[in-house]
């Protein structure tokens, strides 16, 4: 069973402007990922960084939905020195923001097979920095799974 780490934007994608086709497709792909987690076909990770981002979300409806989705995450990861050290090394490798570096470090630390994000710039940064966390857009993940 795949262990996946979803960037926080995947938890919120369903609230973004559905008039843009890319956003609508990503929202559907994220919804499918959460349905697969519900059916125990995949495992998801919830980290202290997700929790932190959700605390600072100014929209109560979004916060509540993210907390509901968080219940689907079977693997939980709290703050650890090893994660912070790994995040610092990722920042040096790829000039990642602290937040992105911590999400990537959490994915790496939990041995998640995939890091899923709606942020194409982040995907390109991860790939060019040679960080060994397979990073995909949710639509690309669903497309790959359909080809199996």
Protein language model regions, located:
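Non-catalytic pre-domain segments flanking phosphatase-related domains
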Residues: 1-3
């Amino acid at each position: 069973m795949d262990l996946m780490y979803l960037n926080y934007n995947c938890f919120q994608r369903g609230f973004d402007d559905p008039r843009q086709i890319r956003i609508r497709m990503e929202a559907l792909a994220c919804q499918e990922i959460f349905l697969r987690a519900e059916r125990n076909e995949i495992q998801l990770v919830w980290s202290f960084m997700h929790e932190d981002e959700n605390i600072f979300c100014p929209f109560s409806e979004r916060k509540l939905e993210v907390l509901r989705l968080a219940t689907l995450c079977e693997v939980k990861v709290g703050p650890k020195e090893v994660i912070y050290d790994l995040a610092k090394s990722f920042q040096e490798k790829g000039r990642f923001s602290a937040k992105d570096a911590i999400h990537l470090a959490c994915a790496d630390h939990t041995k998640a097979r995939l890091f899923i994000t709606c942020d194409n710039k982040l995907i390109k940064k991860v790939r060019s920095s040679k960080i060994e966390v397979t990073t995909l857009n949710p639509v690309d993940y669903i497309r790959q799974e359909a080809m199996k």
